[in-house]
Amino acid sequence: MIGTMNTADKSLIQMDLALRRRFSFTEMPARPEFLAGVTAFGVDVEKLLTRINQRIEALLDSEHTIGHAYFMPLKKLENNADREACLASIFQSKIIPLLREYFFDDYERIGWVLNDSVKAKENRFILLQQSAQLPSFSALFPKEIADSLSDRRFRINDNAFASAEAYQGIVA
């Protein structure tokens, strides 16, 4: 029997301890090389995953690197448009939510992992919301609190998922 478990998942600690007593474990690190030759949006997916994982390891640790399995559906797709749609879906429904969990919704750090700071605003996955769209801190809090806060309200840029430059910027 083969079972898999993400070592970063601490919510199942009792189950983890029980399994560790009963089974032997083999570490299965991410293997971006399994994605060699796969491209989408003009980006080598092996390099994309490698760069993302290098940044995650620098900011967190190797236990949080993203596995190649998330990207394996791309391998069976022949059509570039299908691969692009699949990669967008992987990022939107798997990678971004996973990064949100890893970084406790610290969107600034998520942006660092995705190298958003070097991209044009429209190609960033994470955007700082415009203050004009939101109530000011002075409208929300007493002056002494409002004056001490830095506006760090972020949002996901849904348009980036269909942007080649958004993915190309990750490996830049």
Predicted features and spans:
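C-terminal regulatory/interaction module of P-loop NTP-utilizing enzymes
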Residues: M1-A172
